[in-house]
Structures are given as structure tokens and as C-alpha cells.
Amino acid sequence: LPEFKGQQVAGSDGSLHPPRHPITVREIMCHTSGLIRASDKSLKHTQSLKEDVALYAKHPLRQEPGTKFEYNNCGINTGGRIIEVVSGMPYADFMQKRLFDPLGMKDTTCWPNAEQAARLAHTARRNVDKPDPGVLVQHNADKNVPARVIEKLSEGMPVPAAVLADMGVGMARTYARRYAEPAGGYFSTAHDVGALCQMLLNQGVYRDKRLLSAGAVRTLSAIQTGDVPVNPQEAYGVGVFVKIRDDEGLSVGSFGHRGARRTVMWVDPTNRLAIALLVERFDMTGKEQQVVYGSVFKAAIAKYGPAH
């Protein structure tokens, strides 16, 4: 990506200086690149992953590459753009050909059709009008979101931000013209995510077909952040968190990820188990996550772990 040539680092006093080394692919994929954050207002209204990444390159780095973990969707998107340049294919086409089709992930897409949209889970939240820890309500009260979205999709009309947020997209773009990006926007199902997890658990093999080399899986699931701290329970690999201590029933070395709406997937090589838990909650507290995830993970390991 030649547009990153000459990128500078911003000092605390606003001064600029050359980085000790240019950012690497490894740093991009383990969130230590120092790239600008996706919340910057100058990054809105782009029409392609190529445009997005070109904008990232115009901003100075927030800190020296490799010195701080800072979860950064701009880095993940830059990785996706590298895929486009190296493969010569749009990101969505590459993912479809190399991953989704071989895994039979028929419901994984950035552009749900009418039948898929009708099955979309709505985002839930607490009932703030009548607080009750046991009661959740739909995040958006409109019960006809999928039908309205499909109508607008077919007409190429803009879809309101609130509707997109309820669907789980979380971005106010014209739906029919959305572009695929690694940082978010894909829809999927438990079956499809489970197939991905199974392939990773089997060191890159799914139904007797190798999709990733065993070395690639070892690399992505190995700690890539070195001594840079991430959080007390985890370090980071290539696009995945890696457990550095037993946590929520998962063993050291388990790897996986969680989404903004609290969906999680983990691969636990020690227990020979892959777990995908699909959740649609914006306001789930850290304590609630510990209780729910821990209970589900421990129950799954007890029932399906190596002892069985």
C-alpha cells in the first residue's frame, strides 16, 4: 500500500516525527499499528474499502507502531485492503471463494436477501421504562424492519440509521450500495459460524478439505502482541484474542473473538471444543457477560469436552 509511505507519528505536543519502523501487517492485524481510530469524522462517507484505507494513510499514527494495544477497526480494514491488492479480487469475492463457499456458509453475507432478512434477530435492550433485570425489549420498536429494508434495497433507497442499527449493521449507508469491510457488516447464523469454528479447531481442515495450513492456524492463534498488555485475561494473535489464563471455563491458549453486540466465538484446543454463542444486546454489562458466557462455556465443556 504505497499511500502509507512517509506516514508520521504524532507526538503528545502535536509535533510529527518518522516512526521507528513502518507499520507491519502483523501490527495491523493485532491492533498495535497506531493507526487513526474509526470514530474520526473525516472517515465518513467513503464508497469503497480502497477509499477508506487511503484516508487512514493521510493521518499521522497515534503512537509508535508495536508499542500499544488499541482495538482499531481501521487496522482490520487495512488488512482487508491488502487482501484485495494481493489477490486482485474485491474483499467480499475473496471471502466468498476462499472461505464461505468451501465451508458451506450459505447465510453469511453483507447483503441479506428477502428470505434472510426475514430471519434477522432484533437487537434487545433493558426495559428502561419499567426497569426489571429479567425483562428485555426490542431495541427498535418497529416490528416491520426486515420488510421495509427489503423494499428500500430493491429500490436503491437510503435506509434510516435507526433501521440499520436494529438490523445489526450499525452504519447509516445506502443499504444496496454498502461495501464489504472486515471491521463489521457481515450477517451470519449459528450454523455458519460453527463451521468456521470447526475448521479452526481442526487446524484448517473442514470435512476432509484443507482451507488453511496448520501453520497459518498456529500463527493466528499464537500471541503476537509480545509484552504489550491487552487485558488481564487475554493477549492477541492475528485477528483473535488468546487466553493467557483459564477464564470463563476456557483453557489457556483458547482463541476467538466477540462482537459489539456480545456475540462470541471461542476455539478451545485443550478441550477440543468450539463454542459460538449468538447474542444481540447493546447494553450487556461486563458482569452479565461473565455470568452468561461462563455458565454456557462451562456447561458446554462438561457435556461435550474431552471427558465425553
Regions found by a protein language model. Name each.
Residues 5-252:
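Short, surface-exposed loop or secondary-structure junction motifs
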Residues 38, 275, 287:
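Active-site-proximal flexible loops/turns
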Residues 256-259:
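Short loop/turn motifs at secondary-structure junctions and domain boundaries
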Residues 261-274:
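Short, surface-exposed beta-strand/loop micro-motifs that present aromatic residues
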Residues 281-284:
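A short acidic/small-residue loop/turn micro-motif
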Residues 289-308:
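Surface-exposed amphipathic alpha-helical segments
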